[in-house]
Amino acid sequence: MVNVEAIRKVQRAEGPATIMAIGTSTPPNAVDQSEYPDYYYFGSPTASTRPSSRRSFKRMCEKSMIKKRYMYLTETYWKRIQMFVPTWLLPLKARQDMVVVEVPKLGKEVQPKAIKGMGQPKSKINPLVFCTTSGVDMPGADYQLTKVFGLPPSVKRLMMYQQGCFAGGTVLRLAKDLAENNKGARVLVVCSEITAVTFRGPSDTHLDSLVGQALFGDGAAALIVGADPVPGVENPMFELVSAGQTILPDSDGAIDGHLREVGLTFHLLKVVPGLISKNIEKSLVEAFEPLGISDWNSLFWIAHPGGPAILDPGGDQTRPEARESCGNQACFSVSMATCQVFVCSSFSTRCEGSPKEEGLKTTGEGIEWGVLFGFGPGLTVETVVLHSLPTH
């Protein structure tokens, strides 16, 4: 007689899911944030806005902590479009024609980096999780990536469109379940974002759009997530201990995105930083109370910054190091679902050995336990508990 429980036991991994490798990539086109308002954004002959709007946008760029933004849209391409139609009115078809092709292409660039870090051939990859806020299509970017990267046609795929800035946590939550419930699985997670679907010129009637234009750039990131690493071959960076998602109370309409003929439009309320500050400790308590941890200053933090106000609303709930870790990505523009992965990658890079950080004993910059946060439409919060591993 077949024993279902015995079958399930064989199918499941023995240990926790781990982040085994990370790869990141950005488009070659880079723009200094200090030059972006005058020379790139307001340089269009169709951009006639009030001086107050210009000053507001410059102030947003200055406070963003971003030093350089990477963009698929080059200045030449952007100005050529502006000769015919303001970017506020650029039709969805034109945006889709760009991102449907370029999102999988940018995603393809990061896969070899992640697979090299895993130390296993790409034939070990299964399943594939692809996430993007940039465009929608059928078959999706997961299908296109499978074809261009030469993955087996039998690879299990999951496509996530239109999730927003919390999705960096979502993909880890899903990858954790996939890795722990499928023995031997090596989950390839790819996030690829190109802001052509949201990019538009200034408008005096849509001032909340300026926030997204000031913050978001383009980039792609890939992770390999798996359990029971092969000794001497795979060297995991973090263990994924737990993962949760919640919708914050009284947050309806705080962050919205709507796909319209003019592309993906953003609507942000000023109360977002306050809502997160007010509720973030509850998420921390729920995640860390089972571990006996209540000192948030003892954790390393990885979060989607979404602008400095998100993690520094004037409160005591977040530690200075949280803002510092997020700043590693903010220096190179914020990229929706990929942001948290970029920060994870920067942790790994620093632990590998610049003189300043020599001697760090864990992948969490010497700290054992950490938290990864994602904030986005809903207002939705993803919380992932990370356990760092020895660097040697």
Curated annotation (Swiss-Prot):
Q: Which reaction does it catalyse?
A: (E)-4-coumaroyl-CoA + 3 malonyl-CoA + 3 H(+) = 2',4,4',6'-tetrahydroxychalcone + 3 CO2 + 4 CoA
Acyltransferase as a keyword of this entry, yes or no, is yes
Question: Which is one GO molecular function term here?
Answer: naringenin-chalcone synthase activity
The pathway this protein participates in, as annotated, is: Secondary metabolite biosynthesis; flavonoid biosynthesis
GO annotation, biological process: flavonoid biosynthetic process; polyketide biosynthetic process
The EC number(s) attached to this protein equal 2.3.1.74
Task: Please name the catalytic residues of this protein.
Answer: 165
Q: Does the keyword Transit peptide apply?
A: no
Keywords of the record, alphabetical order, are: Acyltransferase, Flavonoid biosynthesis, Transferase
Question: Top EC class per UniProt?
Answer: transferase
Family designation:
Belongs to the thiolase-like superfamily. Chalcone/stilbene synthases family.
Function description: The primary product of this enzyme is 4,2',4',6'-tetrahydroxychalcone (also termed naringenin-chalcone or chalcone) which can under specific conditions spontaneously isomerize into naringenin.
Protein name per its UniProtKB record: Chalcone synthase
- From which source organism is this entry? Persea americana (Avocado)
